[in-house]
Amino acid sequence: MGKVSVAEIKELMTATGVGMMDCKKALVEADGDMEKAVTLLREKGLATQAKKSGRVAAEGICTAVVKGNVGCVLEVNIETDFAANNDEFKAFVAAVADTVIETNPADVDALKATKISGGDKTVEETLQDLFIKIRENMVIRRFKRMEGILVPYVHGAGSIGVMVKLDSDIAADNAELLAAGKDCALQVAAMNPAYLNRDCLLYTSDAADEL
């Protein structure tokens, strides 16, 4: 098949988010078979992703999300700050945070193998699809899932994420309690303290001495 229609190219671009010329080449190679063209684009994207996996992902987003009494603080890295501001990348980070809250994965590898929140693919498969569009190395760096009275804080566009857990007999929706939690979160974001109080430091030192 030598030619493909503009409508076919647009359909493939809409389905994959890939550029016009790449979609045209894939359709020509696939003899106009739309499903085969999608597969070809995915295979080429995965090959490129493997080549770029060693590139440093120094930018990214930290997010902190609470739903009910369960929360997640998450860091996902990408190569450039320009790509970090991409709406689809931001949506991916938000969906991954929801996945952590909903499924409680044991670690990053388990998270990547889990079906992503609101989708029909795993987190890893969704990341691979996003790579085909953005063409930058992305890394789910770390996450922490917590339960209890939680107060989240995200600094700026996501350069810092903080989750504060409060132990209190006061109702979880008490405005003064939440304001105190917010103040603590702001302090953590500003100062990056190594421990909660002096007792925590002494406990850590004692444990190290015992070893």
Predicted regions and their residues:
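N-terminal assembly/interaction segments in proteins that build large macromolecular machines
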Residues: 2-205
